[in-house]
Amino acid sequence: MAMSERVAVVGGGVIGCAVARELAPEYDVAVYEKGQIAGEATALAAGEVTMLSSYEDYPDIGWHAVEFFREYDGTGNFTFTELPSIGFVSPDQEAEKREYAEQFSADGLPISYLDSETASERYPTFDFSDHAGVIEHGVSGFLDPYTFAITLQNDARADGATFHTDTPVHDLLVEDDEVVGLETDDGRVDADHVVCAAGWRTREFLLDHTPVPVRPYRTQCIVLEPEEPLSDGFPMGWYPGEHVYFRPEHNGDFLIGGWSFAENEPEHASNDADEAFRQHVADLVPTFLEGFERAGYVDDWAGVDGATPDTRPILDAPSDAPDGLVVATGFNGRGIMTAPVAATAVRSLLTDDEAPFPMEPFAIDRFDTRSDDFEFISISASE
């Protein structure tokens, strides 16, 4: 590989920033973003890191992310706060979830099944009376998404990467079935490789070259102030049957998110949480947490991300695509936590070096069709 090979990255969200940081020491990297860095889905993310529960079937993927966040903690203003996470188990799921915990704990993952009595002793703020117990994941955590992305950008810049904001990219330039650059608002940009990390917009951008099965969906977050600040031992978690996940804030507030649905008009989607979601949260939270009967409202927001048919991203150089193109999209709300994995995967695809984890879960040929007409699966409803 020539040290001067040029890589153009389409998209300045957390994935684009992570890719730029990974490649900048060896490549001439330029990132093109139509707005501001980390200005859309990244800034609106909840910042949860639950990679081991998301990839229990491929633990090397989960551990790669966890180890990165542990090592990156303290870089610039970035911090990674580790907390356990719990998933509520309904009575009809008890046998299945006990078996799940036994299987993966035997494989060395920090996963346990706690019956409702044990869970109540460990997490006394919760009311588990309607549940058989919880699945406890011992390794998870959270971070501030915007700070993370900007720290990645700063590292990339220090290694020579350039970032071009307010610069829409209009077309992928291809000659003789090879990528040669991009057409942007500022004119033509020559490149030896292009990494498309444009979120839900990736499908339309690449449709003439390689269709990708990605569709937009909208997700929401609300922050509440409980009657007393949450304690240091308060966990992250999710309530699958109610389509929500939650975590504490550093100041003792409570963030709850989810209520995700496919979005047919992403450019016009509201940035505010729906009234239906606000009411759902108001009704639901006091049923499983103490101290929220008179909780105060702090903030809410909503954002649009890209989904794939199986909820896992596409990190691949598709065989039917022009040579030199790498696709990194469809993170289903897990872009923040998957960013270190995505960056390593993209580097592997460019250099042909073997990745330190399986790449099969991210290959585009795992799908039978490239259509975007598929049923959206909400990860907040299924975890």
For each feature predicted by the language model, list its residue ranges.
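Helix-loop-beta segment of a Rossmann-like dinucleotide-binding subdomain
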Residues: 79-87, 107, 113-116, 120-151, ...
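Glycine-rich FAD pyrophosphate-binding loop
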Residues: 24-43
